[in-house]
Swiss-Prot record:
Reported effect, residue 47 to E/K: Decreases the duration of the open state of the channel. Increases mechanosensitivity
GO CC annotation, single: plasma membrane
GO biological process, one term: monoatomic ion transport
Family label: Belongs to the MscL family.
Biological source species: Staphylococcus aureus (strain NCTC 8325 / PS 47)
Membrane-spanning ranges: 15-43, 63-82
Entry-linked Pfam families: MscL
Record topological domains on the Extracellular side: 44-62
Name of the gene this protein is made from: mscL
Gene Ontology molecular function: mechanosensitive monoatomic ion channel activity
Entry protein name: Large-conductance mechanosensitive channel
Mode of membrane association: Multi-pass membrane protein
Amino acid sequence: MLKEFKEFALKGNVLDLAIAVVMGAAFNKIISSLVENIIMPLIGKIFGSVDFAKEWSFWGIKYGLFIQSVIDFIIIAFALFIFVKIANTLMKKEEAEEEAVVEENVVLLTEIRDLLREKK
C-alpha cells in the first residue's frame, strides 16, 4: 500500500497540481494586494472616498465589499488568464523545437539509409 501511495504521490500530474495550488495561493496574495492597495484606492478616489468598500452600505448591507470582491475576482481571473496564455505559448515553442529536432534526425537517418542502399 505504501508503494502504491508513493507511485501516486510522485506522478507528474499530482506534483504539477500541488505546485499549481501553492503557486496559485501565492499569486492570489499578490493580486489581492494589488487590488486592495493600488487599484481600489484609485477607484475610491474617482468615486470620492478612499475606500468605498467599507463606506458603501444601505441598511447594513455592505454592497461596497461585494463590489470590491467582484473587482478582485475579475482582476485575478484576468491575470491568471494572461499567465496561462504566456505559459501555453512558451510550451508550444518548446514542443515545436523538439519536433524540429526529431524531424532533422529522421532526415539524417533516411539519408544514411539511402546511402547504404546505394553501396549495396
